[in-house]
Swiss-Prot record:
Disruption phenotype: No visible phenotype; due to the redundancy with PRORP2. Prorp2 and prorp3 double mutant is lethal. Residues 65-75 have a biased composition (Basic and acidic residues). It comes from Arabidopsis thaliana. This is Proteinaceous RNase P 3. It is found in: Nucleus. The lineage of its organism: Eukaryota, Viridiplantae, Streptophyta, Embryophyta, Tracheophyta.
Length: 576
């Protein structure tokens, strides 16, 4: 079969070389090919007695990988030019970062020594920060600790004498160096100076931690408490390591009231404690000082203790040590129903306290009103206060339902829509679970309610709910989220929704508060092959608990997902 000779653009026509050695000379190094030529590229076969040469028009520019010195030095190779023009300060910083990644302190110090003797390099804050960080990383290495501390302070002194103000990262590194040699006072002074200067660089927990932990290790309790007060004034929240250290130093120095305070802080901020913290708690209760602590008579006032527990939301009273005599410490498990298998006491499902709940409710009202004020006045919207008044009048509910979330669950298919049967199933299930046979309250947007009323298959049930105050229609232009969240918070009842309420977390109170509230009040649901399953709140909270009898239960962090396998410290008094 005879091949049809393709037509070539004139710019690409070339003669067949008489020998192979001339092929390189024949093909241009770079050929500009238009997009149309590239799209219509065809294989061309040129033949003579010595060579069969196959050329793609579109690949001719890439056939020669050899480059001349002129090509390498041309502006078309920006990387080499950029590398050649890199300034010495930037080169030093890159090399220091490389030392940090390799954990090579000796190499970093050698670079620093060379830099301070060079007239071409002016050290800046980034250089000093990188060096100080690397020095602080070796304070726990016995072979390099002394060098790291000594050279670290030399570097810091040069930084300050150069007129460079240390930022938070630099102060943190030097504070760690100071604490490593037992100078908690200097570590604390660095933080106080940083706060006094002000500006954009502010201290963090890691900035305070070296001084606080140093004072605790050296049993300088009062200085440790001073650091804590300074942290509190700066809005820094303690975490487990710091609280545990303060508890240890308080126990070691016989400050029983401080020990009680830090147990409460662990309950509030941590929940489950680590093995290390549990050992510190155990040592305190086994000690002589703990057995000498008495309740000063409050243990006999059961009504006072119960009222305090109720006010706090359950799980603690906060009035101080209760009982007399030695403590008995056991490690055991808690049943799925919340019963301690060591002492038979039932643990509480801890709720938010009255003050927190009231603040939460007020915040919801404020935000709902602000949203209303920002909306276009042309849109009809009933005042949120109308719902507040309605709820005050009819607010005898044990559960609130996010109607839209339930009705639209798993309805994202071709014929899917709002499922009233799903909503009805939840209403019936909660009614049957209610000991007092109370109906829940459904909150649903008015537009959705009107659509259901227009459907003859749904009208009777919806009208029945409205007449029995089981259904409240939120007004047009409103966000029904605020309504069901407000109702559940105000009535301190259950909230049935799968909504994670992440938006609310960021807009309302602290994340820790909202998580605690959700754990106690949110009911999640699923429908498996049409069958409803409600996931009720757990019967007890996995946090440190203090009972009205004076006993303590401390959950320990566990890798087991099965809650019944978690270890708990059960701490009771012989007289209780």
């Amino acid at each position: 079969m005879k091949l049809k000779k393709p037509s070539l653009p004139s710019s690409l026509l070339c003669a067949v070389p008489p020998c192979l050695s001339q092929i390189r000379l024949l093909i241009p190094r770079r050929v500009r090919v238009s997009s149309s030529t590239f799209a219509n590229a065809k294989l061309v076969t040129l033949r003579n007695h010595t060579v069969n040469l196959h050329i793609y028009y579109c690949s001719m520019a890439g056939t020669d990988n050899r480059r001349s010195r002129h090509d390498d030095e041309s502006p078309k190779n920006p990387n080499k030019k950029k590398k050649g023009n890199r300034n010495p300060e930037k080169s030093l910083l890159i090399n220091l970062h490389s030392c940090s990644k390799r954990k090579d302190l000796s190499a970093a110090l050698a670079l620093y020594d060379a830099a301070i003797t060079s007239s071409d390099i002016r050290l800046n804050q980034q250089h000093f920060q990188s060096l100080l960080y690397l020095c602080s990383a070796f304070i726990s290495d016995p072979s390099l600790q002394t060098v790291a501390i000594d050279r670290g302070f030399q570097i810091f002194d040069r930084m300050v004498s150069s007129g460079i103000s240390p930022n938070e990262s630099s102060v943190t590194a030097v504070a760690r160096l100071a604490a490593a040699k037992g100078d908690g006072d200097y570590a604390f002074k660095l933080v106080k100076d940083l706060v006094a200067v002000g500006g954009v660089s502010v201290p963090r927990l890691r900035t305070y931690a070296p001084a606080l932990l140093c004072f605790c290790d050296t049993l300088e309790a009062e200085k440790g408490y001073e650091v804590e007060d300074h942290m509190d004034a700066s809005g820094i929240v303690l975490e487990e390591a710091e609280i545990s250290a303060l508890l240890k130093v308080s126990a070691a120095t016989g400050r029983e009231n401080k020990v009680y305070r830090y147990l409460q802080k662990l309950r509030e901020c941590v929940g489950c404690v680590s093995e290390e913290t549990s050992k510190a708690i155990e040592e305190w209760f086994y000690g002589v000082k703990a057995s000498e602590v008495s309740d000063n008579g409050i243990g006999s006032d059961i009504e006072l203790l119960r009222a305090a527990v109720l006010k706090n939301g359950g799980g603690w009273h906060g009035l101080g040590w209760v009982g007399e005599g030695k403590w008995i410490v056991k490690k055991g498990n808690v049943s799925s129903a919340g019963k301690c298998l060591s002492c038979d006491e039932h643990l509480a499902c801890v709720d938010t306290n009255e003050v927190e709940t009231e603040d939460f409710v007020n915040s919801l009202v404020t935000l709902a009103m602000e949203r209303k004020a920002k909306m276009n006045s042309c849109e009809p919207m009933a005042d949120f206060s109308e719902f507040q008044e309605w709820l005050e009048k009819h607010g005898d509910y044990e559960a609130i339902l996010d109607g839209a979330n339930i009705g639209l669950y798993q309805q994202n298919f071709a014929d899917g829509g709002f499922s009233l049967p799903q909503l009805e199933a939840v209403v019936k299930e909660l009614y049957n679970k209610s000991g007092s046979k109370k109906q829940p309250l459904i909150l649903l947007h008015k537009k959705r309610v009107n659509a259901l009323l227009e459907n003859p298959n749904h009208r009777n049930l919806v009208e029945e709910w409205i007449n029995n105050n089981v259904l409240y229609a939120t007004p047009p232009g409103s966000n029904d989220d605020w309504y069901w969240l407000y109702a559940a918070a105000k009535l301190k009842c259950l909230l049935v929704t799968n909504d994670e309420m992440r938006d609310h977390i960021f807009e309302l109170l602290s994340n820790s508060f909202f998580q605690k509230w959700k754990e106690r009040h949110q009911v999640r649901f699923t429908f498996v092959k049409g069958c409803l399953k409600l996931e009720m709140p757990p019967p007890f909270s996995v946090v440190i608990q203090e009972s009205e009898k004076g006993s303590w239960h401390v959950p320990i962090t566990s890798q087991d997902k099965e809650e019944s396998l978690r270890s708990w410290m059960c701490i009771t008094r012989q007289s209780s």
